[in-house]
């Protein structure tokens, strides 16, 4: 098929002398007739020579059959033919090709342009929608890249600003994390450092007091004897009043606790000896009362704990 450039190069004498593959439609438009005259058809092959008569015959027998279905049936029938049956059609195709080469020596087969479906697919693609019709795909891709670069510079942010922002917002270790206090907290579960918070409820205070009296790991508590630890556990069971333990226990407090322990043990001994003395009993009760007051401390919201129970 000749393009418009080839038809301009050809001389008008050759166009007038060249045979046309098909007659022009008499009632057609001028533009359609011009295209039919300019287009040079390919020479028919053996199958086309054979199917020309068979197609017409099959179309007359089956008027409602589609042309594509007729072509499928003709192709299957052509494959069933033997070489001897195909020979005359092959010879006719060779003769037509020789005549075509003689009439059009500079003929070069050029495939048809894209069909309407392919053009429609290109039209609804991304570059086709963004640009006006008639722009080449290379120019469309360049235009899309330029638009992306334009949006990247909006609001004062450059193309590399996002990476810089991520570097600036990266999580860095605070210098205070390397301090000895923080390392001590990280490597030790110290319950003695907890302080009383007025916003805590009574249930939370009771839980923290029980945990502090049972699982405390401060050096002052580690120096106590097993007797003092048993006293602390007994005090936590008997005394359910919420209180916070002191951060450290001095030697004076340890001696007081040992004295209170002796008094509490002598209270439950059978009467006799020194235990029957009323003055000793009063001193024991007074020491136990002082022990509960020192252990309880100020109550919740500054109220006096119920030590008389």
Swiss-Prot record:
Motif 9aaTAD: positions: 260-271
Cellular-component GO terms for this entry: cytoplasm; nucleus
Listed InterPro entries: HMG_box_dom (IPR009071), HMG_box_dom_sf (IPR036910), SOX_fam (IPR022097), SRY-related_HMG-box_TF-like (IPR050140)
Listed GO MF terms: beta-catenin binding; DNA-binding transcription activator activity, RNA polymerase II-specific; RNA polymerase II cis-regulatory region sequence-specific DNA binding; sequence-specific DNA binding
DNA-binding region positions on the chain: 40-108
Induction details: By bmp-antagonism. Fgf is required for maintenance of expression, but not for induction.
Main location: nucleus
Subcellular location: Nucleus; Cytoplasm
GO biological process: brain development; formation of primary germ layer; negative regulation of BMP signaling pathway; negative regulation of canonical Wnt signaling pathway; negative regulation of DNA-templated transcription; negative regulation of transcription by RNA polymerase II; neuron differentiation; positive regulation of transcription by RNA polymerase II
Tissue: Expression is restricted to the animal hemisphere of the uncleaved egg and early cleavage embryos. In late blastula and gastrula stages, expressed in the dorsal animal and marginal zone. In neurula stages, expressed in the developing central nervous system including the otic vesicles, branchial arches and the lens epithelium of the developing eye. At stage 23 (early tail bud), expressed in the neural tube and around the anterior neural plate. Throughout tail bud stages, expressed in the brain, and in the otic vesicle and branchial arches.
Quaternary organization: Interacts with ctnnb1.
Protein purpose: Transcription factor with sequence-specific DNA binding activity. Binds to the consensus sequence 5'-[AT][AT]CAA[AT]G-3', showing a preference for 5'-AACAAT-3' and 5'-AACAAAG-3'. Inhibits beta-catenin-mediated dorsal axis specification by binding to sites within the promoter of the beta-catenin-regulated gene nodal5. Acts maternally as a transcriptional repressor of nodal5 and nodal6 to restrict their expression to the vegetal hemisphere of early embryos and thus establish germ layer formation.
Domain text: The 9aaTAD motif is a transactivation domain present in a large number of yeast and animal transcription factors.
The name this protein goes by in its record: Transcription factor Sox-3-A
